[in-house]
A protein has these predicted regions:
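Conserved catalytic/binding loops enriched for acidic/polar residues
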Residues: 53
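Soluble non-cytosolic domains of exported or imported proteins
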Residues: 17, 21-28, 150-154, 182, ...
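C-terminal cap/loop subdomain of S1 sulfatases and analogous C-terminal strand-loop tails that border
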Residues: 100-131, 138, 143-152, 156-234, ...
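A long, amphipathic alpha-helix that forms part
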Residues: 11-50, 60-61, 66-112
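Short glycine/proline-rich turn/loop motifs
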Residues: 1-20, 138-144
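Non-transmembrane alpha-helical segments in soluble domains
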Residues: 24-27, 31-38, 42, 116, ...
Length: 282
């Protein structure tokens, strides 16, 4: 991110370092919790035949917590008070060191930039920095290769399809007389044995930011901009926009995206914003 200065030029270094320290401590806590689950599975003899899938749902989050942000989330994803009734101070204020229970901050743009390097953008957008995450699968009785790397692409809907295949159950077509939305995911079981994935095309949409990927080509839009085209194999960091050179590929991928958006009932972001505006105005 060219807007972010190098560490030598950064302001409030002590506060910035503390933000990452708190983030790292949260990761450590999560790791300890996962470790307790694994220990329990091992003690009960279930670890070898339990499929564990670990992944993030998006790239690094560059959201800075300010007053307006806090008003929208306090009471929903954060607490107004600590467990002993003390008020929680929300907001990324360099004069307040994060960490204690009575503070609520984020690690912000600088550390999200570190997390996502070398990819572009962050959570919310669908360039690689917003969507590319690691995925770990552990299942000793079901996955032959241990510690092996796989390079086939998959995405979140494939987790559901994988669970269905592992459990040996069919995805329902209706529930209580109502049709169920068709399953969009494809099982990742072939990937576990290093075979080709059934998924040929990947799709994304988040608040108007759109993308579709097929083979080496990725078509992506940063709302409200135009489509950009990248050879994601040769240019994973999305620096060389080839849309002007390959208009036929842009058209073909754009048609795939439009069909997917219609099938999955993706609302046009501009229309959705206008609908919300009218609702607010009564």
């Amino acid at each position: 991110d060219p807007t972010q200065p190098p560490w030598g030029e950064a302001e409030h270094k002590e506060w910035q370092a503390r933000r990452m320290e708190v983030y790292a401590a949260q990761i450590d806590r999560m790791d300890q919790g996962i470790g307790r689950i694994i220990d329990s599975l091992e003690k009960t003899g279930q670890l070898e035949n339990t499929l564990i899938m670990f992944l993030a749902d998006n790239g690094g989050c560059a959201e800075e917590i300010g007053e307006a942000w806090s008003k929208n989330v306090v009471g929903s994803i954060s607490r107004r008070e600590t467990r002993d009734g003390q008020p929680v101070q929300h907001g990324n204020d360099p004069n307040v060191m994060p960490g204690p229970e009575e503070t609520y901050q984020s690690y912000g743009v600088p550390w999200a930039n570190v997390s996502n390097t070398p990819f572009r953008e962050y959570k919310h957008w669908v360039h690689e920095g917003g969507i590319s995450t690691p995925f770990i699968a552990h299942w000793p009785e079901g996955i032959g290769d241990r510690g092996a790397l796989r390079r086939q692409a998959a995405q979140l809907p494939d987790v559901m399809a994988t669970c269905l295949e592992v459990a040996g159950v069919e995805y329902p077509q209706e529930r209580e007389g109502n049709a169920v939305q068709a399953l969009e995911g494809f099982s990742m079981m072939p990937i576990f044995s290093d075979r080709a994935h059934a998924r040929e095309v990947l799709y994304w949409e988040h608040e108007g930011n759109c993308a579709v990927r097929k083979e080496q080509w990725k078509l992506v839009c940063k709302y409200p901009g135009d489509w950009e085209l990248y050879d994601i194999v040769a240019d994973r960091t999305e620096l060389n926009d080839l849309s002007a050179e390959h208009p036929q590929i842009v058209a073909a991928l754009g048609a795939l995206y439009a069909a997917w958006a219609e099938r999955c009932k993706v609302m046009d972001w501009s229309e959705l914003q206008e609908m919300r505006r009218k609702e607010r105005e009564g």
